[in-house]
């Protein structure tokens, strides 16, 4: 016997949220539908980040519309971090009271020689635990140090615990991309509804 997992039971509205973040450094707008089909448009002004957010959209089956106008003439740091922050806020808002969700998700994703494990807990306790031994400092113009800035921004504002471990990898592009794919699948699993527990919180504390 298996547990039935559904993105959204027929009697519940889609979980949709929109958030804007405007600072002297960036103007970010995010709309997310947790119960989508992987549709939407992404334009952050950082092409490599757009490519990675497409992985979240496609493999998580989240509808995502994201725009960011930032001070990329300085560097990409503010745009990447603030996109992570705003996306995290949108997920937290869309999840609502969290009743009925699976809460936990995990996935292994390969990309050629690279393999990453992602584990997500929609715990209400933000924390990023990451071990990605990059083999170079840049992928094209993308500084790999900014990879963690996106995820720190996301988890701190989505109120999730996330573990990301690249178990094998030599190509930094592959390491990053398979990490985003694994994260997308794990996040999808954690956000989905558990048919057997639709009206309860997945916590013995009765709080998340």
From Swiss-Prot:
Pfam families: IGPD. It is found in: Cytoplasm. Its main location: cytoplasm. Keywords: Amino-acid biosynthesis, Cytoplasm, Histidine biosynthesis, Lyase. The keyword Nucleotide-binding does not apply. Its EC number is 4.2.1.19. One of its GO terms (cellular component) is cytoplasm. It catalyses: D-erythro-1-(imidazol-4-yl)glycerol 3-phosphate = 3-(imidazol-4-yl)-2-oxopropyl phosphate + H2O. The keyword Lyase applies. SUPFAM superfamilies: Ribosomal protein S5 domain 2-like (SSF54211). Pathway: Amino-acid biosynthesis; L-histidine biosynthesis; L-histidine from 5-phospho-alpha-D-ribose 1-diphosphate: step 6/9. One of its GO terms (molecular function) is imidazoleglycerol-phosphate dehydratase activity. GO terms for biological process: L-histidine biosynthetic process. Belongs to the imidazoleglycerol-phosphate dehydratase family. NCBIfam families: PRK00951.1-1, PRK00951.2-1, PRK00951.2-4. This is Imidazoleglycerol-phosphate dehydratase. The gene is hisB.
